[in-house]
Amino acid sequence: MTIGIDQINFYIPQFYVDMAELAEARGVDPNKFLKGIGQTEMAVSPVSQDIVSMGANAAKDILSDDDKKAVSMVIVATESAIDSAKASAVQIHNLLGIQPFARCIEMKEACYAATPAIQLAKDYLQQRPDEKVLVIASDTARYGLESGGEPTQGAGAVAMMLSHNPRILELNDDAVPFTEDVYDFWRPTGHMLSLIHISEPTRPERI
């Protein structure tokens, strides 16, 4: 019995910042952005879009009428939540017209949240061979002007349909988790911009 990603699609806003122009404005070598982080453009979300609209746009083209009946869980992974209580998955579930007997949750852990979302979907589907799970990663990342994280900003969403007998990617059972409380990146409550601390890389010690 195999479980994995059966369909995948993405959505990015039409607006962007040219990374070479940003480098010139910041007085740095363009290759620092173009080759160093491999970016030529940085997506910018207009005020009319957020993680809900981007997530729904990413998912709508991979959902058939049969899929809408088969999806029994919607998970949105994001660090750009628009509500402290209500999951954005609930709104996306409604916009996509997915059948009502579905679980809808939101997961958060910086840029890692989509990984445990996929793992949760896999575990959930092991007991449900005829059902599907829609996993969406959607974010609007913002850093301060001229900050170290400025060139890594962006906006967009990826939607993945997980099911049995996947056509794109089969998930393995092996995984090794590791957690350490490090303030390299965080956004406290009330802050509009993310904070970043860049230090020399360290190798975690084994216990």
Which ranges hold each PLM region?
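N-terminal amphipathic/basic leader segments beginning at the initiator methionine
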Residues: 1-40
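Acidic, glycine-rich active-site loops and adjacent beta-strand->loop/helix elements
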Residues: 10-11, 77-83, 109-113, 137-142, ...
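Short acidic, glycine/serine/threonine-rich loops at helix termini
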Residues: 16-17, 85-87, 118-119, 144-150, ...
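Conserved catalytic cysteine-centered active-site region
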Residues: 32-36, 40-53, 79-132
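Phosphate/pyrophosphate-binding loops at sites that engage ATP/ADP/AMP, CoA/4′-phosphopantetheine
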Residues: 58-72
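Flexible, glycine-rich active-site loops centered on histidine and acidic residues
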Residues: 126-160
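Channel- or pocket-lining gating/hinge segments that regulate access to a cavity or pore
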Residues: 162-169
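Single conserved hydrophobic/aromatic residue that forms the stacking wall/gate
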Residues: 196-200, 204-207
